[in-house]
Amino acid sequence: MLLRRHFWRYATFDEIAELYVSRMLRMAALYLVNTFVSIYLYQLGYSLTAIAFVWCGCYAFKVLAVLPLTRIIALIGPKHAILVSNLIYIPAMIMFANVNGTSLGLLIPALLLQALSVSMYSVAYSIDFSKVKSIHHAGKEIAYMNIFEKTTTGLSPVLGGFIAYAFGPHVVILFAAVLFAFAAMPLLRTGEPVRRHQHLVFRDFPWKLLLQHSAAQFSYGFDVFVSGTAWTLFVAVFIIGVTSNNSVYATTGMLVSVVFVVAIFASYTYGKIIDRNKGRELMRAATIMNALTHVVRPFIQTTIPVAGLNATNELATTGYALPYTRAVFDNADLSGVRVTYLGVIEVISNAGAACAAALLGFLLIFIEQKLAFQGFFFIGAAVSLLILTARFPLYKK
């Protein structure tokens, strides 16, 4: 029992390294593309309203797909699910690279495959890494994985931006497909670390435990869309300016990547704070700081403040995300139904992101475009404060 629960304590170096390598390659591929997808659609002729509703549909599809995908993960195991999710992303990228104009013929299947891949990976990775569970060092372990992730995601937008500037965004997308193929390879070396052929369990599901942070989980997903897709699109369209020479990709890539050093420093420091039983205080302070960054967004007009705000926001989001994730993993242990529990909270966070995208879409219909984004950021600030409503048993001890 102890061996199964604390897999990372007994795993060989090769088993741990393969997940790290696969994770880094996948995140590199993902951030090569994700930073620029909305900009690419805008260049192709999609309106800002259409882009918002495209993302709303994508997240809504994830809401419907997560639990069936979680069922598959329970059957085949998280490592095999990660492998499958990487392979699914390859045709999605190839289709997306061939999207032409505003035709939906390739865009819809590309986004649906992307949604399936991301949802399957997110749940499978959480199941695998949640088994880190260590009373004294879980914060540090989650922080180290965040450092690996931020190292990759910090450098990828710069690389992707300059490739897009030199050769066009479609080349970046195809390059990402190649990286997804390489990301699958390390997972072929060793077997599944957890028991396979499990089932989703809703009988005696700990709904009370879930409800204690369900509003915060919704807010978590909402905030991901505000800080990521919406902010990137706002900066590209209203601050940098989208032109036909693709320079927007290089500039956006550099602005996104300034968080690289900040994220590494913050992850290490925050991990130590969490392990000193100060996770709740860190989560509260960082949540308030994150809300304040959203309030400032509408007033940014040039690229240098964008870089500063991105760095500040990274401090805030890392500050609440690490202790929040630590507590969610603890809840997954307490629930007794780890796989089902993590699948359900993924549904809630995707619902939050879908509502955020839908709200932005409706604001863009009824209000002038720039004003709609500015109002959306103010609303995002208020919604992000719902993270303060989370009540975790871990932080009551």
Which ranges hold each PLM region?
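C-terminal transmembrane helical hairpin of 12-TM major facilitator-type secondary transporters
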Residues: 281-321
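Conserved MFS/SLC helix-loop-helix module at the cytosolic interface between two early adjacent transmembrane helices
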Residues: 64-100
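Helix-loop boundary and gating motifs at the non-cytosolic
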Residues: 2-63, 209-255
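Helix-to-loop junctions at the C-terminal end of transmembrane segments
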Residues: 65-78, 164, 265-279, 364-365
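C-terminal ends and interior cores of transmembrane alpha-helices
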Residues: 87-102, 288-302
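Multi-pass alpha-helical transporter architecture, strongest
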Residues: 2, 68-70, 180-194, 375-397
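A membrane-interface helix-boundary motif in multi-pass transporters
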Residues: 165-178, 245-247, 358-384
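Substrate-agnostic recognition of the 12-TM MFS/MFS-like secondary transporter fold
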Residues: 18-35, 58-70, 88, 110-164, ...
